[in-house]
């Protein structure tokens, strides 16, 4: 639901690293000394002293979370949050989860959390109001439709333009529809993704464009008939446009420097790759279509 990045990260990273007493850029921040410095400095900047306050939306969907329980450490984003906490020296029982609706997460103002992890894509517009970490997942967009819809078999670039799409306000799925598919009919916009799904199920729209992992879940488990059989399919995913997820912080939060240090360490030691293989590996097999 969302992701130029390099320049912004360099500026924010430099500011944050100075504030926290860490050293180096994203590449050098994975060193033992940088993490050691972060473990000492992070507590002074926690939203609630003595704990790391992490936000996400409710409900929290698979595969990012499992059983709508962020605190169980299961699902990609839950596991990543705890892995970051571990790199920063925060014990598991000192990670506290709070609810932050997706649509309000990237509006300007005071945030009542240390960071938000909620499939939030970095965009230049959002970065004017909040601060993002470096990427913890590079994401593609995909089409979800009912199995009976013509788009399942007819999705050439020209054909894609003829369908009526629907999506949640402010998502990168909606942006992809408008910027890349460029349909002849104005997409319908909803305040929640569940509303778009309901419209899809009742044939009010032809398709939804969402992050590929979300699309797989929607098609296989969320959109079902009365007999609990899937009635939707993931038509395919689009080529990457460089979209990526970042942790979201209040604008200028000095914690971002050390979180970037932790993310770099998790990339270097293979933790992120292993978690992606565990929770997100299936999505690499979704066929690629070109708009």
List each language-model region with its residue ranges.
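Extracytoplasmic small-molecule ligand-binding "clamshell" domains
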Residues: 33-116
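Extended ligand-binding regions for polar small-molecule ligands
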Residues: 78, 87, 149, 171, ...
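Secretory targeting and sorting signals
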Residues: 1-29
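Bilobed "Venus flytrap"/periplasmic-binding protein-like clamshell domains
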Residues: 59, 73-87, 120-124, 139-197, ...
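Acidic, polar ligand-binding/catalytic clefts
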Residues: 93-157
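A ligand-binding cleft/hinge motif common to bilobed small-molecule-binding domains
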Residues: 104, 120-129, 178-179, 206-241
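Ligand-binding clefts/hinges and TM-proximal coupling segments of bilobed small-molecule sensing domains
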Residues: 29-43, 172-188, 227-229, 261-291
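Periplasmic-binding protein-like
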Residues: 58, 138-145, 223-261, 282-291
